[in-house]
């Protein structure tokens, strides 16, 4: 095993990377509230794992979406647990994200030179809410259907482009199969890629600039 490690160490400099990661200075004023962002990340990883597991059984059609969710809950081994964890973790992720935003704002973490970290965080917050909106509709039950109908109808109040935005969200003039397909695609492909990119940027900025000082 030592020879294998030495082979990788010679090429990747694993020890140097490990020392750089573990030797970062942590200011003495840091407390448990500075962990809220990390907890949000953990919730996202749980979301990713449980959501990925459910894609093996979920059917994104208006005729089969609800029955496939019932199948996950009642027939799939531990399916009820996986979906329940997905729902609980979603709520926890939103809560931790809100608390994290408040912590950063109240401690002045958005000030120079961390403006871009703050902006990327706000974008991540918008993406997180978008996850909630798109995921809420996927069971295609009464609650999900009417939630989509209301959300997709709100932009119609915008002058000139409102109807165009609503039609884009619905995939047409009314809520139907095209709507569910778009929300499923956004929830499982578009939004995960977006949040991964902005998370990487967010963490790199934190790594580069360090944790903000006390007020």
From Swiss-Prot:
Component of the cytochrome b6-f complex, which mediates electron transfer between photosystem II (PSII) and photosystem I (PSI), cyclic electron flow around PSI, and state transitions. Keywords: Electron transport, Heme, Iron, Membrane, Metal-binding, Photosynthesis, Thylakoid, Transmembrane, Transmembrane helix, Transport. CDD domains: Cytochrome_b_N. InterPro entries: Cyt_b/b6_N, Cyt_B6_PetB, Cytb/b6-like_sf, Cytochrome_b_N_euk/bac, Di-haem_cyt_TM. PROSITE patterns: CYTB_NTER. It comes from Nostoc sp. (strain PCC 7120 / SAG 25.82 / UTEX 2576). Heme c binds at residue 35. NCBIfam families: PRK03735.1 (NF002990). This is Cytochrome b6. Heme b 1 binds at residues 100, 202.
């Amino acid at each position: 095993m030592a020879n294998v490690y030495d082979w990788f160490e010679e090429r990747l400099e694993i020890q140097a990377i490990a020392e750089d990661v573990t030797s970062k200075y942590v200011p003495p004023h840091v407390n448990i509230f500075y962990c809220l962002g990390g907890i949000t990340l953990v919730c996202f990883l749980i979301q990713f794992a449980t959501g990925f597991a459910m894609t093996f059984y979920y059917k994104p059609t208006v005729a089969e979406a609800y029955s496939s969710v019932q199948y996950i809950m009642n027939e799939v081994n531990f399916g009820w647990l996986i979906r329940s964890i997905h729902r609980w973790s979603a709520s926890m992720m939103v809560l931790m994200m809100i608390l994290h935003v408040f912590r950063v704002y109240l401690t002045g973490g958005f000030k120079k030179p961390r403006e871009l970290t703050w902006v990327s965080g706000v974008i991540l917050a918008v993406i997180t809410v978008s996850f909630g909106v798109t995921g809420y509709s996927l069971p295609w039950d009464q609650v999900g259907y009417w939630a989509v109908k209301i959300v997709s109808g709100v932009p119609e109040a915008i002058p000139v482009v409102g109807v165009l935005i609503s039609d884009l969200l619905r995939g047409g003039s009314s809520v139907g199969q095209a709507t569910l397909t778009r929300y499923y695609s956004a929830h499982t492909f578009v939004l995960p890629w977006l949040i991964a990119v902005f998370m990487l940027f967010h963490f790199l900025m934190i790594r580069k600039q360090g944790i903000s000082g006390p007020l």
